């Protein structure tokens, strides 16, 4: 038999079987990397959420009254529930936590069972779009909390809004830490979006290459 005959499936010359194995290897590596990154993201968001939800401080706030030589001090407890924007912040982080947990369970299940969804581009598209939405949700919620924190720190004399961080220093410190961690989580989430986009469009390239190899093999047979 001529030694220069056409390569069999799985030979070094490339084949649909080799391309499918390449797709499977890429899928497994992608799942492992995304599990680690999403786990890090989840830890950041949980810490940010926990700091804001548990942040409490009781202090005395001066209330000036006309006709009185000195302001009247009233005891108040600073907490996120008092501000609508911070309720949005906490709710947004809760949504991201829920989504990330579900996505982690999905990916862990695929790795544990050696499952694959490489042929389902619709799933990759949904994941990419949802990841993008979570990233923008984190960024917008952190921006809202930053604006509220700025008003609490500096006040707004033009509309007679007083500074409150001078009376609630501990609350504002923990508040700031929570917001900074949220911004870091937003950056990590956009790294996740980038990986999702890379995986999505790589699927198109690998599948197109596999289709060309199949057509070439059919033509040579």
Swiss-Prot record:
Residue intervals on the Cytoplasmic side: 1-31, 113-122, 196-221
Membrane association type: Multi-pass membrane protein
A GO cellular-component term linked to this record: plasma membrane
Residues of the signal peptide: none
Residues passing through the membrane, by range: 32-52, 92-112, 123-143, 175-195
Pfam families: CASP_dom (PF04535)
InterPro entries linked: CASP/CASPL, CASP_dom
Keywords: Cell membrane, Membrane, Transmembrane, Transmembrane helix
Region (Disordered): 1-22
Compartments, record wording: Cell membrane
Extracellular side: 53-91, 144-174
Matches recorded under PANTHER family: CASP-LIKE PROTEIN 2C1-RELATED (PTHR33573:SF30), CASP-LIKE PROTEIN 4A4 (PTHR33573)
Assembly mode: Homodimer and heterodimers.
Protein family according to the UniProt entry: Belongs to the Casparian strip membrane proteins (CASP) family.
Protein name per UniProt: CASP-like protein 2U10
Phylogenetic lineage: Eukaryota, Viridiplantae, Streptophyta, Embryophyta, Tracheophyta
């Amino acid at each position: 038999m001529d030694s220069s005959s056409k390569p069999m499936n799985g030979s070094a010359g490339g084949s649909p079987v080799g391309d499918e194995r390449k797709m499977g290897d890429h899928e497994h590596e992608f799942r492992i990397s995304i599990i680690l990154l999403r786990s890090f993201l989840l830890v950041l968001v949980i810490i940010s959420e926990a700091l804001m939800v548990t942040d409490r401080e009781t202090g005395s706030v001066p209330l000036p009254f006309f006709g009185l030589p000195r302001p009247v001090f009233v005891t108040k407890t600073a907490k996120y529930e008092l501000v609508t924007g911070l309720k949005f912040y906490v709710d947004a982080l809760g949504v991201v936590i829920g989504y990330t947990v579900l996505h982690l369970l999905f990916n862990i299940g695929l790795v544990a069972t050696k499952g694959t969804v490489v042929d389902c581009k619709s799933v990759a598209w949904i994941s990419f779009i949802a990841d993008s939405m979570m990233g923008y949700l984190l960024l917008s919620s952190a921006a809202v909390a930053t604006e509220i924190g700025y008003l609490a720190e500096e006040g707004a004399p033009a509309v007679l809004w007083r500074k409150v961080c001078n009376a609630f220093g501990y609350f504002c410190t923990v508040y700031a830490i929570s917001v900074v961690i949220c911004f870091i989580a937003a950056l990590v989430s956009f790294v996740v979006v980038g990986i999702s986009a890379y995986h999505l469009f790589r699927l198109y390239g690998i599948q197109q290459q596999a289709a060309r190899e199949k057509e070439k093999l059919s033509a040579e047979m």
